[in-house]
Structures are given as C-alpha cells and as structure tokens.
Amino acid sequence: MYGKIIFVLLLSEIVSISASSTTEVAMHTSTSSSVTKSYISSQTNDKHKGDTYPATLGAHEVSEISVTTVYPPEEDNGEWVQPVHPFSRPAPVVIILIILCVMAGVIGTILLISYGIRLLIKA
C-alpha cells in the first residue's frame, strides 16, 4: 500500500519537474529574440576594458545582468602577480583538521547506514 503511494508521489514529481523544465526552455526561446542588447559603455581601468550590456524588459521577457570582466592584477612589466590576502596559505594544522573531519563524516555515515541496515534486518 505505502509502496504504491510512494511510487505515485515520485512519478508525479518527475512529471512536474520535466513539465516545468520544458516550459522554461520554451519561454526562454520565445522571449530571447525580443530582448535587445545595446552597448552602453566601454570603460578603461588599468589598461583593461569593462563592458556593460543592459537588457530592456517588457512583460514576460528574460532579464539579463550586466557583465563586467575582471582581470588579475599585473605589475608594471606585465607579469601576473599572486594577490596577497590573509588566507593565502592555511596552517598545516588547519589542513589536517579538515581532512580528519571529512574522514570522520564519511566513516560516521557508513557506520550509520550499516547500523540502520542491521536494525531493518532484525525487524
């Protein structure tokens, strides 16, 4: 009885997901042709350009976010420089603790699943 209910719920969810994804694709293809892009500005900042493309919006049209290209820092001679910030290199103790926590999480999950299987087998 419960198996049939769960099957029907899963099937209805799959149908609703596939229906929503096809309508989003159809809506995107139908309205993307009506979205117009106009070139607004080309700003020069540290010898690099940042272009902005706004979208004009009407009813049921796809909105677009302005895009700005960010380039890595350079020295005067044109070589790339590693940005310096307080978290450039974590201490070895932090790396070891992160690895141990991930291992404990994986081992704990495996033990929890095996404990649950043992309880189901006994019942």
From Swiss-Prot:
<keyword id="KW-0812">Transmembrane</keyword>
<protein>
    <recommendedName>
        <fullName>Glycophorin-B</fullName>
    </recommendedName>
</protein>
<keyword id="KW-0730">Sialic acid</keyword>
<keyword id="KW-1003">Cell membrane</keyword>
<dbReference type="InterPro" id="IPR001195">
    <property type="entry name" value="Glycophorin"/>
</dbReference>
<dbReference type="GO" id="GO:0005886">
    <property type="term" value="C:plasma membrane"/>
</dbReference>
<dbReference type="InterPro" id="IPR018938">
    <property type="entry name" value="Glycophorin_CS"/>
</dbReference>
<keyword id="KW-0325">Glycoprotein</keyword>
<comment type="similarity">
    <text>Belongs to the glycophorin-A family.</text>
</comment>
<comment type="subunit">
    <text>Component of the ankyrin-1 complex in the erythrocyte, composed of ANK1, RHCE, RHAG, SLC4A1, EPB42, GYPA, GYPB and AQP1. Interacts (via the N-terminal) with RHAG; this interaction bridges the (RHAG)2(RHCE) heterotrimer with the SLC4A1 Band 3 I dimer complexed with GYPA.</text>
</comment>
<comment type="function">
    <text>Component of the ankyrin-1 complex, a multiprotein complex involved in the stability and shape of the erythrocyte membrane.</text>
</comment>
<dbReference type="GO" id="GO:0170014">
    <property type="term" value="C:ankyrin-1 complex"/>
</dbReference>
<keyword id="KW-0472">Membrane</keyword>
<feature type="signal peptide">
    <location>
        <begin position="1"/>
        <end position="19"/>
    </location>
</feature>
<keyword id="KW-0732">Signal</keyword>
<dbReference type="InterPro" id="IPR049535">
    <property type="entry name" value="GYPA_B"/>
</dbReference>
<dbReference type="Pfam" id="PF01102">
    <property type="entry name" value="Glycophorin_A"/>
</dbReference>
<feature type="transmembrane region" description="Helical">
    <location>
        <begin position="93"/>
        <end position="113"/>
    </location>
</feature>
<keyword id="KW-1133">Transmembrane helix</keyword>
